[in-house]
Amino acid sequence: MEGEDLGSWLGLGIGGGGYAYGGDDCRRSPSSPSPVQMLFSQHVKEEITRGYDHGRDEEQASGSKIMKGERGARLRVMRSIRNSGGDGSRSRVLSLGDDGGDGGSGSGGGGGTRKKLQLTKEQSTLLEDSFRVHNILSHAQKHELARQLKLKPRQVEVWFQNRRARTKLKQTEVDCEFLKRCCESLTEENKQLKHELMELRRLASAAAAAAGSQLYVQFPRAAAAAMVNVCPSCEKVTVMGGGGGETGKSSSSYSS
């Protein structure tokens, strides 16, 4: 008995719809719902769709906000540069310069990032006098000096810090120059000592060579002219010449 086609089929799919057998070929049935879609109700599917659309809208909104923020920042920078004249001088921070004791020049010395403090001649004189008395101020002294100068205590503190740094730098330069001169003097003295040592060694070697060439030391002529001997048997004085022979005998004798 031949099997009959009952139209039953088994398949798995997501959002693809069902398949129906029609003879030997399989054709897709768009009208039939997918097995996964049948598991959820229409209300749940609408919530999922709304959540997806909401997330996409938030991403687009955040992206547009970032672009607007970047555009606004660029506009603010360009506006500040245009207002400051192109060199950023109006946006510099007012701070105490390194040469505050000299009155300052009013122009930033650190690459155009800082502006030196303008000090009057009286303020500079008072600061220098105070520094010569006390190079480090206490809290009360700092506030009192700031009140006299009509400055902020922080400005006075920074001026003293810079003044101490300049003093230390100048002292270091003086010490360095002194040590440099000492080093040059010692180097010259070392060269002279080496030259003298070489001269002494040369003289010593020459003297040693001269002493080695003469094995015997000659006596003076006055000492070698005559040698007087006394004969113990006859008690006569015998004068011996340089050759060792008798040159003459004395006739005188010594009595005891």
Curated annotation (Swiss-Prot):
Keyword Transcription regulation assigned: yes
The Swiss-Prot or TrEMBL record marks DNA binding at 112-171
- Tell me which domain of life the UniProt entry assigns to the organism this sequence originates from: Eukaryota
User: Can the keyword Transcription be found in this entry's annotation?
Assistant: yes
Bias class Gly residues marks the residues at 102-112
Q: Which GO terms describe its molecular function?
A: DNA-binding transcription factor activity, RNA polymerase II-specific; sequence-specific DNA binding
One of the record's GO cellular component terms: nucleus
Q: Mainly resides where?
A: nucleus
**One Pfam family of this protein, by short name?**
Homeodomain
Where does the protein end up? Nucleus
Keyword list (alphabetical) reads: DNA-binding, Homeobox, Nucleus, Transcription, Transcription regulation
Looking up InterPro entries in the UniProt record yields: HD, HD-ZIP_Homeobox_LZ_Class_II, Homeobox_CS, Homeodomain-like_sf, Leu_zip_homeo
- The segments labelled Leucine-zipper in the record are 170-214
Please list where the region (Disordered) is annotated.
Answer: 52-117
Tissue specificity note: Expressed in roots, leaf sheaths and blades and panicles.
Entry similarity comment = Belongs to the HD-ZIP homeobox family. Class II subfamily.
General function of this protein:
Probable transcription factor.
Q: Which PANTHER family match?
A: HOMEOBOX-LEUCINE ZIPPER PROTEIN HAT14, HOMEOBOX-LEUCINE ZIPPER PROTEIN HOX18
Q: What name does the UniProt record give this protein?
A: Homeobox-leucine zipper protein HOX18
Organism the protein comes from: Oryza sativa subsp. indica (Rice)
Instruction: Please name the gene that encodes this protein.
Output: HOX18
